[in-house]
Amino acid sequence: MLRALWLFWILVAITVLFSKRCSAQESLSCDASGVCDGRSRSFTSIPSGLTAAMKSLDLSFNKITYIGHGDLRACANLQVLILKSSRINTIEGDAFYSLGSLEHLDLSDNHLSSLSSSWFGPLSSLKYLNLMGNPYQTLGVTSLFPNLTNLQTLRIGNVETFSEIRRIDFAGLTSLNELEIKALSLRNYQSQSLKSIRDIHHLTLHLSESAFLLEIFADILSSVRYLELRDTNLARFQFSPLPVDEVSSPMKKLAFRGSVLTDESFNELLKLLRYILELSEVEFDDCTLNGLGDFNPSESDVVSELGKVETVTIRRLHIPQFYLFYDLSTVYSLLEKVKRITVENSKVFLVPCSFSQHLKSLEFLDLSENLMVEEYLKNSACKGAWPSLQTLVLSQNHLRSMQKTGEILLTLKNLTSLDISRNTFHPMPDSCQWPEKMRFLNLSSTGIRVVKTCIPQTLEVLDVSNNNLDSFSLFLPRLQELYISRNKLKTLPDASLFPVLLVMKIRENAVSTFSKDQLGSFPKLETLEAGDNHFVCSCELLSFTMETPALAQILVDWPDSYLCDSPPRLHGHRLQDARPSVLECHQAALVSGVCCALLLLILLVGALCHHFHGLWYLRMMWAWLQAKRKPKKAPCRDVCYDAFVSYSEQDSHWVENLMVQQLENSDPPFKLCLHKRDFVPGKWIIDNIIDSIEKSHKTVFVLSENFVRSEWCKYELDFSHFRLFDENNDAAILVLLEPIERKAIPQRFCKLRKIMNTKTYLEWPLDEGQQEVFWVNLRTAIKS
């Protein structure tokens, strides 16, 4: 029993593991181009079922601890393999043996405590290799990279354990586009370790201390074009002459990111510049300066050796005692030939006038995200300041008056571009003064509600994005580019305001439509961005977009950013795909069609009414309604006649001379109702007919050819027809005065025709011997 129980649990475990593996295999998704994504799928091993069709495989963020020699054998055409953060601690020596086409390999942030050169031997096509973030101390016993002749990007090292860089580490590498070394725990650097790489375009060094900086600098001086130092504490850096002969260093850019400096160490760093004669750009990002700016270069030749530095960039510089900071007079001469300076988000509130006057070559100055106000700006832009300045960026400072700002900058005679965006200005005045050469003005995110003539007429580029504008009516004759996105405009501005406009960006406004005429009114417009507006997909707009395939040449964000906001049935549809309904877009044609159809219907109904005696049925309905208002059966006291005689005027001789004489002079006599004698004068004929029939016990119809042609006889027959069949009253007596064709009786009297087929009627005999019998039968019928 116990054995069976163990066997059961083993089978359950195998089933669970197999189902998990199958589920994992199913979650590996590949597209038609061979790019497979297996990120964060809880794989515990390389998935099976890999094929030669795969070009890219990403298995990052899994739990793969081991890569065996056969796991990737099927991926002969694989070009990209990403195994980042997958807990890998063991890789077989020939695991990558079949990956001769591999160009990109990422093994970063795993648990590889040692590296093997056998992994990389077959990877002759490899261009990118990332080994960063693994807990190894060195790069292995032998050189890892002698066969990687095509390698362009290499990332190595870690934060805590990588402690030694040796000569053999980079043997075989002669040229790299990018080399990144994270060695924050570096304890030993073997001289000339990096010297074997003759050409490095961009070298990034993560060093916590500056102990080995001079040795490394000496090795890379002749090979690196862009050196980036990260997270380095340079507070204790001391310069000493480098053990190198005169060399022409190709280094163009030097960057410090996250570094710590002091006034003294800054002076020491300046001494390095004598070895970098071609240096043109220096950058400080997220650095800390523990000092007061008391820079005092001790060697006079430093000044001359800074001659080719044209760009200085400082971002987010933290100076704990910035309010005590010096005026930098000691470095004025160092920056005389600099053309571009950026000091961003560094609590700058003043550039001393004398410093500004020394920046004679400065063409570009960016003081974004600082503390500048008009009073201090006036001191900075004093007479003679920045004489060559063409572009000034004062974005996100504390400027308030547009008028004062313009007047202060009048001293900058060569200023052509001004960015004062993200300042909170007071309402725009009607007039302002600006430098006469100004061509570009950025007023985005300044909260302006109205654009006035304060804006200079000389502008070629104007940016008023992200404000509260609901209209734009300023004439700018030279304007070529207008950026007015994220406002409240409901339509495109009038084209006559910008006769030479080339580019307009009006995204995220309240524009509901635009037309062919509107776009055509801009004679030189080449680019329009009007997406993400509240478009009303009217017939005119949709018709225009469907009939103008060249829109994609002008609308750079067409078609994905152009969506219908209304009507509701088209909400969210692209203008390109939306189709208007016939009811909305062809109302005139639709109304015309409906009217024509209605007219045809009326004609058809009229023809049918004529053919099927519709008017007669209407008259019959009227008579029926009239009769319904009266009691269904007249009281006995209202029945005044034994019979109402309905006859044609042409048959009056027979009725008056024969029928009346025979019936009214009989014993007992019958009282007959004749229209000539008994109708009430002045009363409507139809009312007389109805009343006479209702007051008569019977109705005698004297049928003849004349009868069926008589109009009034038809009315009498109509109402009798109603009385006969609506009241189930057998009150009609048919007297056939002369033989008539049955088809002469109108089709509408279908029941009357049926009676003539099913019931006996009296026929006037021409034989005088039979006429007495006829009268006897008629009297009997009236009495019944």
Swiss-Prot record:
Assembly description: Interacts with LY96, TLR1 and TLR6 (via extracellular domain). TLR2 seems to exist in heterodimers with either TLR1 or TLR6 before stimulation by the ligand. The heterodimers form bigger oligomers in response to their corresponding ligands as well as further heterotypic associations with other receptors such as CD14 and/or CD36. Binds MYD88 (via TIR domain). Interacts with TICAM1. Interacts with CNPY3. Interacts with ATG16L1. Interacts with non-modified M.tuberculosis protein MPT83. Interacts with PPP1R11. Interacts with TIRAP. (Microbial infection) Interacts with Staphylococcus aureus protein SSL3; this interaction inhibits TLR2-mediated cytokine production.
Function: Cooperates with LY96 to mediate the innate immune response to bacterial lipoproteins and other microbial cell wall components. Cooperates with TLR1 or TLR6 to mediate the innate immune response to bacterial lipoproteins or lipopeptides. Acts via MYD88 and TRAF6, leading to NF-kappa-B activation, cytokine secretion and the inflammatory response. May also promote apoptosis in response to lipoproteins. (Microbial infection) Mediates activation of bone marrow-derived dendritic cells and macrophages, and production of pro-inflammatory cytokines, such as IL12 (IL12B/IL12A), triggered by Toxoplasma gondii micronemal protein 4 (MIC4) and micronemal protein 1 (MIC1).
Free-text disruption phenotype from the record: Mutants succumb to Staphylococcus aureus infection within 5 days.
Residue positions the entry lists as glycosylated: 147, 414, 442
SS bonds (residue pairs): 30-36, 353-382, 432-454
Residues in the signal sequence: 1-24
Name by which UniProt lists this protein: Toll-like receptor 2
GO biological process assignments: cell surface pattern recognition receptor signaling pathway; cellular response to bacterial lipopeptide; cellular response to diacyl bacterial lipopeptide; cellular response to lipoteichoic acid; cellular response to peptidoglycan; cellular response to triacyl bacterial lipopeptide; defense response; defense response to Gram-positive bacterium
Top-level division of the source organism's lineage: Eukaryota
Family: Belongs to the Toll-like receptor family.
Organism: Mus musculus
Lineage: Eukaryota, Metazoa, Chordata, Craniata, Vertebrata
Membrane topology listed for this record: Single-pass type I membrane protein
Modification after translation: Ubiquitinated at Lys-754 by PPP1R11, leading to its degradation. Deubiquitinated by USP2.
UniProt-listed Gene3D superfamilies: Ribonuclease Inhibitor (3.80.10.10), Toll/interleukin-1 receptor homology (TIR) domain (3.40.50.10140)
Segments forming domain LRRCT: 525-576
Distribution of this protein across tissues and organs: Detected in a macrophage cell line, smooth muscle, lung, spleen, thymus, brain and adipose tissue. Cell surface expression detected in lung alveolar macrophages, dendritic macrophages and at lower levels in lung macrophages (at protein level).
Cross-link (Glycyl lysine isopeptide (Lys-Gly) (interchain with G-Cter in ubiquitin)): 754
Subcellular location: Cell membrane; Cytoplasmic vesicle, Phagosome membrane; Membrane raft
LRR repeats: 54-77, 78-101, 102-125, 126-150, 151-175, 176-199, 200-223, 224-250, 251-278, 279-308, 309-337, 338-361, 362-388, 389-414, 415-437, 438-457, 458-478, 479-500, 501-524
Feature type site, description Interaction with bacterial lipopeptide: 349
Residue ranges occupied by any TIR domain in the UniProt entry: 639-782
GO cellular component, one term: phagocytic vesicle membrane
Gene designation per UniProt: Tlr2
Membrane spanning stretches: 588-608
